[in-house]
Regions:
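C-terminal lobe/tail of nucleotide-utilizing enzymes
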Residues: 207-250
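N-terminal glycine-rich dinucleotide-binding loop that anchors FAD/FMN and/or NAD(P) in oxidoreductases
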Residues: 53-71
């Protein structure tokens, strides 16, 4: 493997063993002499550091810009409401009401305000921890309690550890916005699944996402001895590389 590589480990559902695989893969590459970074992008429930003897050295608070209106000079024209695709500004009796939890920090309202009475303030969205554990550089995000949108924090987290030869992204489960943001810019992805009807259904959704993002990917089946053969048949029918099938063992469970 030449050059710097970003590998995303993802899954259509939680509990498939995605984080275990991410940590194991990071440890294997580190043992081969590579400078490896593990980025825990599951910022709502980060737990990758629990598998490492992590020495956290840096904790940084992350902010995102949200609009604020100078109401004394606002004319109530409604341009800000019209330009916002996320309904983060609504006009009530010709006065704009900002809904910060709906805001995607695009800056459209600021740039389009004809009176220039909208400006941005910084809103805390979470923290990012950076440290070292088991010869692996670790960075993980933790979303602030009550903060509804994870993608801005994930985007900030992915700016860490660029000096590593290999960056492994432990993506959040599912196929919603946090998972999509985690997958972006990856050179390849590994989708972890289990051989059950629910596992196959959610795998198909995850496959749709990585194909839409045009990311090369393969499948790992975890606990391959507890279900049926439907995932294997799906991979064959869709011409998807099956990278590994791992049986459920008491040795793995003990870890």
């Amino acid at each position: 493997m030449e050059g710097k590589v970003q590998i995303a480990i993802a899954s259509g559902k939680g509990g498939t063993g995605k984080t275990t695989l991410a940590v194991t893969l990071a440890a294997r590459y580190a043992a081969s002499g590579k400078l490896v970074a593990l980025l825990d992008c599951d910022v709502e429930e980060p737990n990758a550091n629990l598998f490492l003897k992590t020495d956290i050295r840096i904790t940084e608070t992350i902010y995102t810009p949200v609009p604020r209106v100078d109401e004394d000079n606002c004319t109530g024209c409604g341009k800000c409401e019209d330009v916002c695709n996320f309904n983060a500004i609504v006009l009530i009796k010709e006065r704009p009401l900002v809904l910060p939890d709906m805001c995607h920090s695009c800056g459209g309202c600021v740039s389009e305000c004809p009176e220039k009475v909208i400006y941005e303030v910084q809103k805390e969205i979470g923290t990012i921890e950076e440290g070292y554990g088991d010869s692996i550089v670790y960075a993980g995000g933790r979303l602030k309690i009550g903060q509804p949108m994870a993608p801005p924090l994930i985007k900030a987290l992915k700016n860490y550890c660029f000096s590593a030869d290999i960056r492994i992204i432990d993506a959040p489960p599912g196929t919603s916005c946090p998972a999509v943001e985690s997958l972006r810019e990856s050179d390849c992805a590994i989708l972890v699944t289990e051989p059950t009807p629910f596992g196959l259904n959610d795998l198909k959704l995850a496959v749709g996402v990585v194909r839409r993002l045009d990311i090369p990917f393969g499948i790992v089946i975890n606990r391959s001895d507890i279900g049926d053969n439907s995932v294997v048949e799906y991979c064959l029918a869709e011409n998807i590389p099956l990278l590994r099938s791992e049986e459920h063992t008491s040795e793995l469970q003990s870890h």
